[in-house]
């Protein structure tokens, strides 16, 4: 059984997704008037996710300089969150989603697929460079590049409410990093 909530004020929400601002609230759902099968119900579809898939392939040289490519797929609510920013331009998208979360990374190019097909994942291909951090003879880097998981949401010393992310989430990360011998 599917629940459809149509919101004409948000042009990026497809009909198969409950708009995010009413997700997990209550609404008057009318199923069958003849059988009195209607009433106030929680607007929730556990099958629809905030879904990110990130594939990173990168090489790191002896000086700790990383060059690589990433393919990123944003589906369902993840796509929905990013579309308004993408419509403002690729540079604004890079400034919003890549630069603040991945400090030190330079995005050399960004290409986007399925921008106008709301039933398909928003796919991006990114070429990037980064100077890895170092301490003495060791170079280190985060494998969570472009995933949305760069910063830990649980590091606050004092929390004043329960953690509720607003929708079910699924993150898939694949990484292949080549490092110099030795």
Regions found by a protein language model. Give the residues of each.
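A sensor for short, sequence-defined functional sites
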Residues: 1-182
């Amino acid at each position: 059984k599917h629940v459809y909530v149509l919101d004409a004020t948000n042009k990026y929400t497809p009909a198969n997704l409950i708009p995010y601002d009413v997700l997990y609230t209550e609404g008057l759902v009318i199923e069958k008037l003849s059988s009195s099968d209607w009433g106030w119900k929680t607007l929730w579809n556990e099958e629809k996710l905030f879904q990110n898939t990130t594939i990173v392939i990168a090489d790191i040289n002896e000086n700790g300089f990383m060059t690589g490519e990433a393919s990123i797929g944003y589906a369902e609510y993840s796509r929905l969150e990013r579309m308004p920013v993408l419509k403002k331009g690729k540079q604004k998208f890079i400034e919003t989603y890549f630069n603040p979360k991945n400090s030190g990374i330079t995005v050399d190019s960004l290409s986007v697929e399925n921008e106008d097909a709301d039933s398909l994942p928003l796919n991006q291909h990114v070429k990037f460079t980064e100077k890895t951090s170092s301490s003495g003879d060791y170079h280190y880097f985060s494998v969570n590049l472009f995933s949305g998981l760069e910063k830990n949401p649980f590091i606050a010393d004092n929390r004043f409410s329960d953690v509720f992310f607003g929708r079910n989430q699924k993150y898939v990360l694949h990484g292949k990093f080549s490092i110099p011998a030795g």
